[in-house]
Design a protein with these regions (language model features):
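Flexible, glycine/charged-enriched surface loops at secondary-structure junctions
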Residues: 29, 64, 70, 89-99, ...
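Long, charged amphipathic helices and adjacent flexible linkers at domain junctions
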Residues: 21, 79-117
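Helical hairpin unit composed of two closely spaced alpha helices linked by a short loop
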Residues: 3-31, 35, 146-147
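Glycine-rich phosphate-binding active-site loops on the catalytic face of alpha/beta enzymes
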Residues: 1, 49-73
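Nucleotide-binding motor/catalytic cores of P-loop/tubulin-like NTPases across gene-expression machines
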Residues: 139, 145-170
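Catalytic cores of alpha/beta
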Residues: 34-56
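C-terminal helical cap(s) of enzyme catalytic domains, especially alpha/beta-barrels
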Residues: 12, 67-90
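Hydrophobic faces of well-ordered beta-strands that scaffold small-molecule active sites
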Residues: 26-30, 54, 61-63, 150
Length: 170
């Protein structure tokens, strides 16, 4: 899509929000550490892009050319890991994209998922454990972007692979 460059950050945030609201995985992947194809260190702008993707609570970050044909693939992965880990520590809950629960919905799974995530902030809960045959329950829990991990017990390997991209699901 061709858009003026100054609109890209706003459009990215809108698209991330739409994916979260639709309970779809969000992957940010465009030139995250592009300069590390030829240089051992990223630019400050690249570092900020990675941190912002974490602050927006995306499900996954992805490298491409940096690891496919770059001169510093291991360094690129280590760099992204360090930046993401620090951003996870620094993120502020008040900046989260909140998902409202549709009051007119009869979706019991979404209702229970929202309440479970809310409970983690009020009770001494450090994880949410769920079984997940199709992945739907775990994805609902992930969509509400809780502070603590969702431990999904899966019955099918395919479900486990699909959930690997979901925010906070282990």
């Amino acid at each position: 899509i061709e858009v003026p460059q100054e609109r890209i950050p706003g459009i990215q945030r809108v698209l991330i929000r739409k994916c979260i609201l639709a309970k779809k995985p969000v992957i940010v992947a465009t030139q995250m550490l592009h300069t590390m194809i030829n240089n051992p260190r990223p630019t400050r702008a690249e570092v900020t892009d990675i941190a912002n993707a974490i602050y927006y609570r995306t499900d996954a970050l992805m490298l491409s050319g940096e690891t496919a044909y770059g001169k510093y693939p291991v360094e690129a992965v280590k760099t992204m890991t360090k930046i993401a880990a620090q951003a996870e520590k620094d993120k502020l809950e008040e900046n989260d994209i909140r998902i409202p629960l549709d009051e007119n919905s009869n979706d019991v799974t979404a209702f229970l998922a929202k309440q479970a995530v809310k409970a983690t902030s009020k009770l001494k809960i450090r994880a949410i454990i769920t079984d997940s045959y199709s992945g739907r329950t775990a994805r609902n829990l992930a969509a509400f972007r809780g502070k603590y991990p969702v431990l999904a017990i899966c019955y099918k390997e395919k479900t486990m692979r699909h959930l690997a991209l979901s925010y906070g699901v282990e």
